[in-house]
């Protein structure tokens, strides 16, 4: 697994946990990585670069949540955000953050990573759902945004 993929997965877990327990996402991210380090999940280790990338993603999503959610709501024509699975919504939030605020990451990389994370953490139809909405959003993002 690449460092950035690991970072995206950690960020997803932190944002998802934040939604469930209404706790600060950075605190959740720290707890997730500490539990791995303490051996609760001995097969997982947290790379410091992955943690830094996850932290950047979490902070970016939280800081820009209104703009990100607005884009998602605008392009998810037949789905209210309240109806979306929390995992799918947070995968979308992470990817939309990358599309809007990380022009150094190619759009196709962001989309592919989101789809792969959706396959791993989401339901059977999550990958196609995420792909459909991200495709709509990506088509409206200019390189200057």
Curated annotation (Swiss-Prot):
Belongs to the NusB family. Keywords: RNA-binding, Transcription, Transcription antitermination, Transcription regulation. Involved in transcription antitermination. Required for transcription of ribosomal RNA (rRNA) genes. Binds specifically to the boxA antiterminator sequence of the ribosomal RNA (rrn) operons. Gene3D superfamilies: NusB-like. InterPro entries: NusB-like_sf (IPR035926), NusB_fam (IPR011605), NusB_RsmB_TIM44 (IPR006027). This is Transcription antitermination protein NusB. GO terms for cellular component: cytosol.
């Amino acid at each position: 697994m690449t460092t950035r993929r690991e970072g995206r997965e950690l960020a997803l877990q932190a944002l998802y946990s934040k939604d469930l327990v209404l706790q600060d996402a950075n605190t959740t991210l720290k707890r997730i990585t500490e539990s791995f380090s303490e051996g609760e999940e001995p097969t997982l280790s947290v790379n410091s670069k992955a943690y830094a990338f996850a932290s950047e993603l979490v902070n970016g999503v939280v800081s820009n949540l209104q703009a990100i959610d607005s884009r998602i709501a605008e392009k998810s024509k037949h789905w209210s955000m309240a109806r979306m699975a929390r995992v799918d919504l947070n995968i979308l939030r992470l990817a939309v953050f990358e599309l809007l605020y990380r022009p150094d990451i190619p759009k196709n990389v962001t989309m592919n990573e989101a789809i792969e994370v959706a396959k791993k953490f989401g339901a059977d139809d999550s990958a196609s759902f995420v792909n459909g909405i991200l495709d709509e959003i990506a088509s409206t993002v200019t390189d200057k945004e």
